[in-house]
């Protein structure tokens, strides 16, 4: 991947031996945006898990814009896509001043199960999305996503998320938002 750092224009590289072992690398704002939006909105009626940091300076607002993030949350709700969000305990406290209350309301309005984790589970701004058929490791601010489809890798990552469920505190999204707005 370091060999790709000099590339600034949007690009997609696919490295694969067969369908089960493909790796797709997306570089640049447009490629990252297209890949993440496609992955999140093409799985109607499915469930995904996301490990999501509370870094307010990340590329989400730069690449997508707050309005488009709210539209994405609405699309997830309308397509009945269920998100299992693993987020830091201070998620809303960090992001509401930056993205606004309406953004937070759109976040909890979608079909969402929230698991809170201590901040030390988020040492970087990299994030991870997992669907039944692929895992996506991404760093929006770094303008890169890596998509993995190997079954053994997916099983390992899904097992990690199952473990996180036993460690995390499951909260009601609406109650969590109300509590965060009071702070």
Predicted stretch roles:
Residues 22-24, 146-183:
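Signature of lipid phosphatidyltransferase scaffolds
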Residues 1-7, 80, 86, 179-183:
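Intrinsic structural disorder
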Residues 29-153:
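Hydrophobic protein-protein interaction segments
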Residues 1-22:
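Short, charged amphipathic alpha-helical surface segments
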Residues 16-24, 104-114, 183:
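Short charge-dense sequence patches
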């Amino acid at each position: 991947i370091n060999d790709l750092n000099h590339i600034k224009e949007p690009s997609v590289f696919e490295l694969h031996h067969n369908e089960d072992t493909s790796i797709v690398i997306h570089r640049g704002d447009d490629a990252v945006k297209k890949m993440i939006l496609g992955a999140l909105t093409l799985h109607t009626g499915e469930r995904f898990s996301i490990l999501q940091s509370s870094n307010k300076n990340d590329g989400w607002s730069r690449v997508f814009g707050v309005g488009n993030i709210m539209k994405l949350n609405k699309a997830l709700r309308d397509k009945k896509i269920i998100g299992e969000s693993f987020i830091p305990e201070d998620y809303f406290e960090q992001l509401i001043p930056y993205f606004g209350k309406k953004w937070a309301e759109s976040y909890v309005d979608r079909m969402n199960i929230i698991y809170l984790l201590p901040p030390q589970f988020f040492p970087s701004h990299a994030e991870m999305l997992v669907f039944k058929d692929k895992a996506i490791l991404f760093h929006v601010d770094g303008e890169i996503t890596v998509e993995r489809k190997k079954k053994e890798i997916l099983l390992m990552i899904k097992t990690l998320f199952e473990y996180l469920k036993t460690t995390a505190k499951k909260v009601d999204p609406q109650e969590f938002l109300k509590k965060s707005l009071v702070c």
